[in-house]
């Protein structure tokens, strides 16, 4: 499923796995929750408890891919790699 379809379906949570300094330097998506990649394991229950699709994104899509694979390996099926910040921002702006 394309990211546009996931976003149009609604009922999702955007999770930005970049470091806080990256958000300050590069910008952020207002509705996104910032949980750096290094904190995901400690905050697993918090993320697991979110209803709907969890869309991870980062600067380029690499860390969000790791986050997506981690949660899939933990048994979650409602996770999606949203890719890089700039690309996701463009998609959101054009919906």
Which stretches of residues belong to each language-model region?
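Short, surface-exposed ligand- or partner-binding patches at beta-edge/loop junctions that are enriched
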Residues: 57-58
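Rhodanese-like catalytic fold shared by cysteine-dependent sulfurtransferases
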Residues: 2-12, 17-54, 64-95
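Conserved G/P- and acidic residue-centered "switch" motifs that form tight phosphate/ATP-binding loops
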Residues: 61
